[in-house]
């Protein structure tokens, strides 16, 4: 009887120990399950952050691409404006050359006109001298008349040349007037171009400022990309570590669950053995 009581006490103690171990195993399994759930939550948060980082990286790259496209377009407009200014400067130079040639033609025509005027004055003087001497010598008169006719012819030729010079002068004046109009138009165009050039200069300054800002933004984007890439690598490392931890903890949970099942089976066997012992005692 004492042996049975001792056996019952030992079985009871073993039962209590098995229950304690089962409770401890359940508590440990619960804690491990909570750790697994926490790590899974951290893993989901990490994956969300990774997606956010990737989206921010794509957005930064798109903004950088847009800024580069705008900068290239503005540089193209500046080059076109510079080409137009160069072409207009060439046209102004051609107008100045035409004006110089017109001034040279006008100078030559003026000199010819002065020569014709001097010839006419000389012919008139000779004619007067011949008239004063006509009474002295008939032959001299004939000579003078011949000289007079020649002088008249010279005068007519001078008049003709004068008319031609005057006509050419009128043409030159017309050319000069057109050249002046073209020069004035060129000057007006220069003023317009200077204004456009000033605007282009201001735009160029704005473009330079935009370019500096774009470069700064590009540096900032590169820094952000570097940081985001670093954060991405860290997140991937943490994710890999979390996955390994989850796998490890899952194995531990499986082991504890197996141990719990084993303890429950052991507890069940002890309970059945106690029931059988009680039945045997009741038989006595």
UniProtKB/Swiss-Prot annotation:
Positions of region (Disordered): 1-47
Biased composition (Basic and acidic residues): 12-38
InterPro entries referenced in this protein's UniProt entry, alphabetically: Tropomyosin
Record flagged with keyword Coiled coil: yes
Top-level taxon of origin: Eukaryota
Keyword Zinc-finger carried by entry: no
Chain coiled-coil ranges: 1-284
Keywords: Coiled coil, Repeat
Matching Pfam families: Tropomyosin
Membership in a protein family: Belongs to the tropomyosin family.
Subunit comment: Homodimer.
Description of its domains: The molecule is in a coiled coil structure that is formed by 2 polypeptide chains. The sequence exhibits a prominent seven-residues periodicity.
Function: Tropomyosin, in association with the troponin complex, plays a central role in the calcium dependent regulation of muscle contraction.
Name of this chain's protein: Tropomyosin
Organism of this sequence: Trichinella pseudospiralis
């Amino acid at each position: 009887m004492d042996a049975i009581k001792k056996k019952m006490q030992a079985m009871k103690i073993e039962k209590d120990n098995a229950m304690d171990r089962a409770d401890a195993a359940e508590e440990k399994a619960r804690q491990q399950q909570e750790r697994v759930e926490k790590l899974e939550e951290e893993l989901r948060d990490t994956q969300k952050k990774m997606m956010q980082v990737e989206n921010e990286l794509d957005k930064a790259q798109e903004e950088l691409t847009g800024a580069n496209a705008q900068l290239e377009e503005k540089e193209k407009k500046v080059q076109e404006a510079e080409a137009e200014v160069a072409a207009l400067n060439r046209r102004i130079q051609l107008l100045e050359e035409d004006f110089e040639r017109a001034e040279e033609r006008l100078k030559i025509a003026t000199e010819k006109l002065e020569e014709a005027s001097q010839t006419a004055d000389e012919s008139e003087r000779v004619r007067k001298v011949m008239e004063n001497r006509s009474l002295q010598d008939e032959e001299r008169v004939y000579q003078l008349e011949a000289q007079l006719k020649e002088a008249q012819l010279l005068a007519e030729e001078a008049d003709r040349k004068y008319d031609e010079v005057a006509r050419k002068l009128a043409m030159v004046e017309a050319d000069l007037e057109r050249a002046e109009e073209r020069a004035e138009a060129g000057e007006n165009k220069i003023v317009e171009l200077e204004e456009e050039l000033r605007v282009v200069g201001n735009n160029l300054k704005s473009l330079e400022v935009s370019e500096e800002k774009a470069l700064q933004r590009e540096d900032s984007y590169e820094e952000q990309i570097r940081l985001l890439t670093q954060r991405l690598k860290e997140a991937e490392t943490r994710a890999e570590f979390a996955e390994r931890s989850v796998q490890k903890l899952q194995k531990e949970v499986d082991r504890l669950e197996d141990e719990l099942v084993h303890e429950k089976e052991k507890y069940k066997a002890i309970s059945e053995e106690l029931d059988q012992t009680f039945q045997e005692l009741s038989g006595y």
